[in-house]
């Protein structure tokens, strides 16, 4: 089983578990206050301070709601939509920063507070979206003279209200609130179980780590009795599954990884699925999947199924061909093998690349030290998006390891980004990007944060990264740039990447393609010991190796998408998590299922993306189509870069996703470029 996509960014929606579009009340200046009291982590970072900070924001939110309701008719944009947007600001920033503390705060009491406060804020958000008086006031606003962005904002807001059940009777609205509050609490517990209770694998001696890189072994010294403890964090899991020669070790790690938070999260998941289904039914939908897609580009669960089937047809033959090639290779090396187990996939793909493409994935790691990769990301983004980055050493941060960077467009300060990039005890284990402050044109600068778990960050550790980690870094950084460049709207509710959720991954997935270009890579990839620039022939072989397995990757994404859908398109009393897992796994993976796999207990996307994991597949199609518009001989300097910034990123959420696609491509997306991308490994054109 491949890993689900690392990104977890979500937009504001009542369907989202957490309202994390990060909306903040306007400040009198658009410069950064170095001791900004509006950030929850500034000052004394303890539970009482966090609780007071959130309480203050909730009080301001209520003041804006009262202002809206007290306004005299006629209802106007300024006396109704403006205070509504300000109320959302207060809820948004409170929810975003409370959840941020839940995910990254070094102090356990602050993480505990973040969890409780995130639930409290989501409850307030539910109350706002079930308030009929607010809905009627918004619906009465005269939009005849409104600009297109304001009209789009209002239309989408009213749709979200209807999807929340505002037009239902009092009893139904009360039940919806009860359901929403329950889901929020359960989802937070699901995430907390993953965050604070990772599984471990213990090896008896260093010999069991045969095949692992020397720096990995050095970073895992044995205990007094000689045993070595490995975690299921990405920094341990991925190297073990890729390089360990021991089948037994890989199998134990695989099962440890796919049983994280089991059985506790199994019961939580079943409870959430039941509650979502019941909520969808009282809102008039056949299933939660139908409710969850009603405000998306895809439009309906039926459209989602049709799209996934179309991609399945396009990718299945190549995926099976890849597996046959891999199995034939494995049989040459290990006569008698009848199938490649799930825990052998990454190992055999790496071995295949070494022989077929003369590419050892360990050979590029010395060229990708964390510090140089970070600088390379900043330099590449600066050239591509026509911005610059300057350190902000005086910016308050929640941990000394976090760095802050100011973003400039020419001489104009346009935003700030925070990088929290290395593992810590109690910190979220995944890779994600989130807004921290939404931009409001002329009033407020946008801020965003990267939460990752890459190697490095410790004295003496150069932080050697795998190529896939480098690509992930640029992917997540793309979300930050979307938040900054799209954060110049008049309304906080449509700023940054507050588009439909099933568009939000497309810009970042497109950026992944840039890091196959030799010129871009060689600008920063240098050997940490010799300072040698990454050789072009090594890049060519790396690109050939990375092109192999694309169709299988797509099939893996279809598995995650289909499993997410299958858990949300039927009555909960018919759901058997393990039976559906086995069925969907067998449909999309040729690798035999490993008994004991309970991956759903660690599949956090089921909480945030609910039924809509298909987002990653749809957005990959869009991303590859976008990339096809760039001049491959001048990726950073061609005309497409600025045109892309203007057409796709700068509008933020002020336009529908379909309009953003058409604006850049001149047409709707199609599968043509995607099919060529999948077929590249068989055309011998990887470069």
Predicted regions located by residue number:
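N-terminal helix-rich structural modules
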Residues: 34-213, 229, 630, 687
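Active-site-proximal, well-structured secondary-structure segments within enzyme catalytic domains
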Residues: 153, 185, 192, 197-231, ...
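Short His/Asp/Glu-rich catalytic/ion-coordination signatures at enzyme active sites or charged loops
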Residues: 37-49, 97-117, 139-178, 231-266, ...
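C-terminal, non-catalytic "cap/extension" segments appended to globular domains
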Residues: 34-48, 52, 56, 227, ...
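Short, hydrophobic/amphipathic alpha-helical patches that form generic packing surfaces
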Residues: 89-100, 155, 159, 255, ...
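N-terminal secretory signal peptides that target proteins for export/translocation
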Residues: 1-13
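Short pre-active-site segment immediately N-terminal to the catalytic Zn-binding motif
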Residues: 455-474
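Bacterial N-terminal signal peptides
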Residues: 13-29
């Amino acid at each position: 089983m491949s890993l689900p996509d690392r990104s977890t960014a979500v937009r504001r929606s009542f369907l989202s578990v957490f309202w994390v579009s990060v909306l903040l009340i306007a400040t009198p200046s658009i410069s950064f206050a170095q001791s900004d009291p509006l950030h929850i982590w500034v000052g004394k970072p303890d539970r009482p301070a966090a609780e007071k900070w959130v309480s203050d924001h909730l009080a301001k939110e209520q003041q804006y709601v009262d202002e809206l309701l007290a306004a005299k008719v006629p209802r106007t944009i300024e006396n109704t939509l403006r205070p509504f947007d300000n109320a959302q600001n207060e809820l948004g920033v409170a929810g975003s920063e409370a959840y941020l503390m839940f995910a990254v705060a070094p102090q356990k009491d602050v993480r505990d507070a973040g969890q409780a406060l995130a639930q409290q804020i989501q409850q307030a958000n539910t109350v706002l979206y079930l308030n009929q008086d607010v809905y009627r006031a918004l619906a009465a606003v005269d939009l005849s003279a409104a600009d297109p962005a304001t009209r789009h904002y209002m239309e989408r807001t009213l749709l979200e209200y209807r999807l929340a059940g505002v037009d239902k009777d009092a009893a139904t609205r009360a039940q919806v609130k009860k359901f929403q509050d329950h889901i929020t609490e359960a989802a937070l517990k699901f995430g907390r179980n993953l965050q604070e209770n990772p599984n471990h694998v213990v090896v008896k001696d260093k010999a069991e780590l045969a095949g692992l890189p020397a720096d990995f072994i050095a970073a895992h010294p044995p205990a007094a009795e000689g045993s070595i403890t490995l975690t299921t964090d990405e920094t341990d899991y991925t190297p073990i599954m890729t390089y360990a020669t021991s089948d037994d070790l890989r199998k134990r790690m695989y099962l440890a990884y796919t049983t994280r938070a089991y059985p506790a999260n199994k019961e939580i998941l079943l409870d959430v699925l039941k509650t979502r289904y019941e909520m969808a039914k009282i809102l008039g939908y056949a299933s939660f999947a139908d409710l969850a897609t009603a405000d998306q580009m895809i439009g309906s669960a039926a459209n989602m199924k049709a799209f996934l089937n179309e991609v399945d047809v396009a990718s299945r033959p190549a995926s099976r061909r890849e597996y046959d090639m891999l199995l034939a290779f494995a049989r040459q090396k290990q006569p008698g093998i009848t199938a490649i187990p799930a825990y052998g996939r990454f190992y055999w793909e790496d071995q295949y690349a070494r022989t077929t493409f003369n590419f050892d994935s360990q050979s590029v790691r010395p060229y990708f030290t964390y510090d140089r990769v970070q600088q390379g990301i900043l330099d590449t983004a600066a050239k591509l998006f026509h911005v610059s980055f300057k350190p902000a050493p005086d910016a308050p941060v929640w941990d000394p390891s976090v760095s802050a960077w100011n973003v400039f467009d020419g001489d104009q300060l346009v935003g700030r980004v925070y990088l929290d990039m290395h593992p810590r005890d109690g910190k979220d284990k995944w890779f994600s990007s989130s807004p921290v402050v939404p931009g409001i044109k002329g009033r407020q600068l946008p801020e965003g944060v990267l939460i990752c778990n890459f190697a490095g960050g410790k004295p003496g550790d150069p932080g050697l990264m795998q190529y896939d980690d480098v690509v992930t870094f640029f992917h997540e950084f793309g979300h930050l740039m979307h938040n900054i460049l799209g954060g110049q709207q008049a309304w906080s509710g449509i700023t940054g990447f507050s588009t439909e959720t099933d568009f939000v991954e497309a810009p970042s997935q497109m950026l992944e393609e840039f890091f196959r270009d030799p010129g871009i890579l060689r600008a920063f990839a240098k050997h940490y010991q010799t300072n040698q620039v990454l050789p072009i022939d090594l890049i060519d072989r790396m690109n050939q190796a990375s092109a192999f397995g694309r169709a299988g990757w797509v099939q893996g994404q279809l598995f995650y998408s289909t499993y997410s859908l299958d858990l949300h398109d039927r009555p909960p009393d018919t759901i058997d998590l393990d039976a559906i897992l086995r069925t969907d796994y067998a449909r999309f993976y040729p690798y035999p299922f490993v008994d004991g796999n309970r991956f759903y207990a660690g599949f956090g996307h089921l909480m945030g993306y609910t039924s809509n994991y298909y987002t990653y597949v749809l957005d990959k199609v869009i991303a590859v189509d976008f990339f096809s518009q760039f001049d491959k001989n001048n990726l950073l300097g061609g005309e497409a870069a600025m045109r892309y910034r203007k057409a796709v990123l700068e509008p933020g959420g002020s336009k529908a996703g379909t309009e953003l696609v058409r604006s850049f491509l001149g047409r709707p997306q199609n599968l043509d470029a995607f099919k060529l991308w999948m077929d590249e490994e068989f055309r011998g054109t990887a470069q």
